[in-house]
């Protein structure tokens, strides 16, 4: 059956919402791995439509383990696939955002196309990444941030992980990932790896009714807010999108080069983030401030992006991000001890 859909998209046909749901279910339920890889490659080459993405998201969310949070929360996430091997900026920014008082429910996974995914660097920082919904809620309430490891909350995707990793190129799942937060966070910062995807995802985000506000952006070839150069994005709320162009230097940031944002493996990236949290200035600290400032603004705790950046900068300077990280590590250790005593 998947072969039928593969032939259809090879002929440049577009799938309906229901067909996109069906093809996703086929991929999750034992289709031939070679056909799945071919389908994903052809779909990426042909280009996805907003309707196809929305249908695939629907199929995946129906099979997910959902998390009901009794308060609004925010996620900072990127599509990945920019192949730049930068430090885990969105993960570090999530910790700084939590230090700024924003409840963070971060959804992520291990690396697919980079050296270190969000789950990898969090483990290297000493965080327990596998938490039940109940443990996650306690973590956010006590620490201000929690992490939902994709294989735990989207177990159906485990079957596709080896295929995606074996492809060694970005696929449609890079677009789907940021839209699959199990907590259905009302607020999101979503970075995308190129401008065509920015336009596509802005149309997809308009179809989601559960979100209050989303900031979707692309910056100088990366799925991160950095000071490399101009950032373009969309502020999406109440069924409308507003295009925004941002010059980081207008907020007091110095321009940087891509080499200043480079990371390594998960241990190296954990070390780099800790240095930034401990007061080391530079391009990485600026990127964390930029992203967290946007989070403060989008969440409504600042009236402008400039004010949000000022709050994030002051919070980082005062060492609050490092304190949140230490608190998160302590929570993780206590959780492991609690589990051990129950066995």
From Swiss-Prot:
A GO BP annotation: L-tryptophan biosynthetic process
Pathway annotation: Amino-acid biosynthesis; L-tryptophan biosynthesis; L-tryptophan from chorismate: step 2/5
SUPFAM superfamilies per record: Nucleoside phosphorylase/phosphoribosyltransferase catalytic domain (SSF52418), Nucleoside phosphorylase/phosphoribosyltransferase N-terminal domain (SSF47648)
Gene3D superfamilies to which the protein is assigned, alphabetical: Nucleoside phosphorylase/phosphoribosyltransferase catalytic domain, Transferase, Pyrimidine Nucleoside Phosphorylase, Chain C
A GO-annotated cellular component: cytosol
Intrachain disulfide bonds: none
Binding positions for anthranilate 1 per the UniProt entry: 78, 109
Cofactor binding summary note: Binds 2 magnesium ions per monomer.
Residues at which Mg(2+) 2 binds: 223-224
Record: residues binding Mg(2+) 1: 90, 224
Keyword match Magnesium: yes
UniProt entry keywords in alphabetical sequence: Amino-acid biosynthesis, Aromatic amino acid biosynthesis, Glycosyltransferase, Magnesium, Metal-binding, Transferase, Tryptophan biosynthesis
Signal peptide annotation: none
EC numbers, comma separated: 2.4.2.18
Homology family: Belongs to the anthranilate phosphoribosyltransferase family.
UniProt-recorded name of the protein: Anthranilate phosphoribosyltransferase
Organism expressing this protein natively: Chlamydia felis (strain Fe/C-56)
